[in-house]
Amino acid sequence: MSAALSPPQTSVSDASRLDKLPRLSPRQVRIFFWLLAIALGAAQAWATRFTMNPDGISYLDMGDAYWRGNWHMAINAYFSPFYSWILGFFMKVLRPSPYWEYPLAHLVNFLIYLAALGCFEFFLRNFIRSRRHSDENARKQGNVTLPEWGWWMLGYALFIFASLQLITLRLITPDMCVAAFVYLASALILQIQTGAGTLRTVMFLGIVLGLAYLAKAVMFPLALVFIAVAGCCAHNVRQGVRYAAMAVFGFLLIASPFITILSRSKHRVTFGDSGSIAYEVYVNGVDQFVPASSSLKHPINKIHDMPPTYEFGGPIEGTYPLWYDSTYWHEGIRPYFDLAQQFHAIAASLVTYWRQFCSVFLQLNATVALFVLYLIAPRSSACLKCAGASWPLLVIGLAAMGLYALVYAESRYFAPFIVLFWLAAFSGVHLPHSRGLVRTIAVVVVAVSITSIAQTAWNTPSEAPSTADYYRLATALRDYGITRGSKLAVIGTEPFGKSGAFSARLARAQIVAQIRSSDLFWAAPAITRAEVLQALARAGVQAVLASDLPTSADLSTGWHRLGTSTDYIHVFGRDDQ
């Protein structure tokens, strides 16, 4: 029975036939995937060049504040500074017109994507180098693993999918910056694990993690995971302590100045409040935009009860103050633990992860491929043991996904960590050396790569490039006297969209008031709508913007269509006699 279950032996003639199987040059694979990654990234950046998102408005506002020296506005405990520095630099140097402002932001995103591509190349090179010793031992034992060209192909396919499908260049967010730093830090940890690392390597690791923290506050706790893993990769306890201490020093060298400034501005020690606010919103159920609590230090001024209407003209600046610095408006609320709420949040995150791994539109291809390769192995447990050799990547990837699971998991957040997880998981593939299984591995790798790239290419917008709707509406606003510094109000639960913050940013206007429900406003009697508008006028609002109007909306009382859009404006002093 044991003989029947033992792996088939490879004879000399079999080995010679295996050597005659077609082989791909790793260099050719790398060049092809570099060109493919650049082409797909450029196509996505171009197709989405006129799009904008809420976070992007705040980062653009913050970048402007940093580069003009408005430190009171620039220091922000909700949005981290690094990405805004980059955006602000390009805006200050190139000074784009309103038409080109959002396309320039997407160009910056594309450049960061290229930097992430370079960081991933460095990481994948170190990962493959770290695999050579174990792969050589596997061959000596009569086993076969992924060939080097297979690692390059699979790695780049996963990178392209994670970068363009999960993070995307459509969104103006720092997630691509974070991905670049995660790949760079992971490469340095692999150097330490293989014995190629020095104190200089560990120092650089700390610096990279410090920059990652400046890109996104969640990297502060995750930096501790990276540093702990780096210490555990050392050859002995004494060296591990030295490595951890040096990494902490490098991290604090970069992070401590901003932590000090931020703590002084908040009058308490903090490395950022985005995590606590996320917990309030996604776990405790606090309203993101208009929090309600008797403990609020800065309650938002409610100027009309029904429909609920709020004014928030100061002291926070930015195109939309409620989103620019949520920490000010949430100050006084303390997140609290509730078992039922926590269970619900974790369950929602697990559903997100389930979809990530098991949806045909995401990464079911990789999940099925991995299961197939593990199941055809003589002992699947041996594959798991081999994957354990890549434990640093597994620990980092699972720690990040676990941290997000406690609050809120979104694909762009965990994208680089899922790449680490997949590479570590596929490193466990060890099959008996035979012609059929060598071809099976090759076919599986090619299939996963092709399907991942095909999904990404399919979802990259291929229709005519999106039009400059926000610019056209900003131009229409100027026709109604809306200029730099004008105070606006919007109607809707979230003031984003063509006639909201996205157009207000290009007009350099500020949204200082909001009617929270479009349906309630337009369904109210005419006298009630007039009272709401009068309250907005008394609050210093110059004009009210409305979009997504119901068909029954009464536009006879001074509402004007903005250009050829479906958005409308009411200008005080002109439309209310």
Tell where the protein language model's regions lie, with residue ranges.
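Transmembrane-helix motifs of polytopic, lipid-linked glycan transferases
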Residues: 107-143, 184
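Perimembrane helix-loop-helix junctions
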Residues: 16, 221-252, 265, 423, ...
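Short periplasmic/luminal acceptor-recognition loop of GT-C membrane glycosyltransferases, typified by
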Residues: 302, 467-468, 475-518, 542-550
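Membrane-interface alpha helices of multi-pass inner-membrane proteins
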Residues: 161, 188, 201-217, 223, ...
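Membrane-interface transmembrane helices that cradle and orient dolichyl/undecaprenyl
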Residues: 144-146, 185-202, 212, 230-234
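Extracytoplasmic catalytic/substrate-binding loops of multi-pass membrane glycan-assembly enzymes
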Residues: 48-62, 73-90, 96-103, 266-273, ...
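Short acidic/glycine- and proline-prone juxtamembrane loop motifs at membrane-interface regions
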Residues: 54, 79, 167-178
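Lumenal/periplasmic acceptor-binding loop at the mouth of the active site in multi-pass
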Residues: 284-382, 514-517
